[in-house]
């Protein structure tokens, strides 16, 4: 089974070419560092427009066949930060524990983490996770929840993702003997 992971950088300025897309590239680099499972990266940069974010999430989940989509940016309280709303609009189930865990981890580093509205949800066989827009924050937040991501993808019928245990251990419950 071909594994496709999606990364969407939500940024007005990056989508207009006004600055280099470092958040999205940082996210792909982290996934390549942590995963030993070969994967193809689906990639997009979209403006902070809810309809465009929703359309790209649907395209990656439904057409590109991504088992995991991570978004970067658009998770704060500013009026144009609508990534969580777009995620909720396209998901059948929400996983609020992801946002709670990321905020808890970030609060140990910076008090403004409480302003983050990032979340996660499931669309079909795809897990969608919102991340902040700064590369340092992306790593800190993704590290807080990544140990649960491969098992979540197992549970929703996606491919088995294996990681480099030295750089990113994951948790999968052991099967109980029959």
Label each PLM-derived region with a short phrase.
Residues 1-178:
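Non-catalytic beta/alpha edge segments that cap or flank active sites
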């Amino acid at each position: 089974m071909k594994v496709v992971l999606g990364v969407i950088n939500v940024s007005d300025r990056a989508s207009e070419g006004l600055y280099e897309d470092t958040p999205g590239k940082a996210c792909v680099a982290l996934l390549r560092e942590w995963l030993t499972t070969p994967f193809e990266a689906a990639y997009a940069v979209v403006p902070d427009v809810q309809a465009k974010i929703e359309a790209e999430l649907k395209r990656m989940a439904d057409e590109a066949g991504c088992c995991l989509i991570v978004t970067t940016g658009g998770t704060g309280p500013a009026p144009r930060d609508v990534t969580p709303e777009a995620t909720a609009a396209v998901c059948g189930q929400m996983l609020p524990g992801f946002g709670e865990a990321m905020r808890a981890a970030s609060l140990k580093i910076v008090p403004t983490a409480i302003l983050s509205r990032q979340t996660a949800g499931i669309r079909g066989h795809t897990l969608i996770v919102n991340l902040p827009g700064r590369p340092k924050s992306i790593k800190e937040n993704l590290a807080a929840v990544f140990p649960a991501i491969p098992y979540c993808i197992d549970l929703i019928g996606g491919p088995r993702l294996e990681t480099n245990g030295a750089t990113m251990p994951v948790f999968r419950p052991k099967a109980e003997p029959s």
